[in-house]
Amino acid sequence: MSRQLAKRWITVDEYERMGEAGIFHPDDRLELLEGEIYKMSPIGSPHAACVKFLSAQLNRLFNGKLIVSTQDPIRLNDFSEPQPDVALLRWRDDFYKYSHPTPEDVLLVIEVADSTVESDRSYKIPLYAKAGITESWLVNLPEEQIELFATPADGAYQIIKTFKRGDEAQSHTINDLSISVSDVLG
């Protein structure tokens, strides 16, 4: 009689306890996605510069109105806690000291991708849609464009737009957010 192997997914609570217990190396860059732990790709200079630029611009635009979160965890559900490059969060005076933001707190997620474009587009962006995050951007460094995904329904984004160098990327859900694609790409 053959026996099927069964996967056992890790919950966010278990993952966080593992981190607190020192199971992971301090230099490990990890994400929990759908119950599985993934090693994050190294961050190159163009990627890092883009994240810094976005963070600075968004802080300038929304200072005191929204929280700009950079490479911090978001608890999507009991089995996923990604660390998007940038996220715009609803303002909270405690700055989420007692719990990570959840989808209801997130107005926009931005993933910056160089070597991870396909996996971010086909795996992480749909994960954000399934969680109900209203808008996600993929800054596609190789193709020099920003891909906007908005209005999640039935686990997928209904609106998809592409902004090229020379365009202004205009948020679909945040009225005051418009940013030069050329400036973002550097």
Q: What are these language model-derived features?
A:
Residues 1-186:
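Gly/Pro/Ser/Thr-rich low-complexity, intrinsically disordered segments predominantly at protein N-termini
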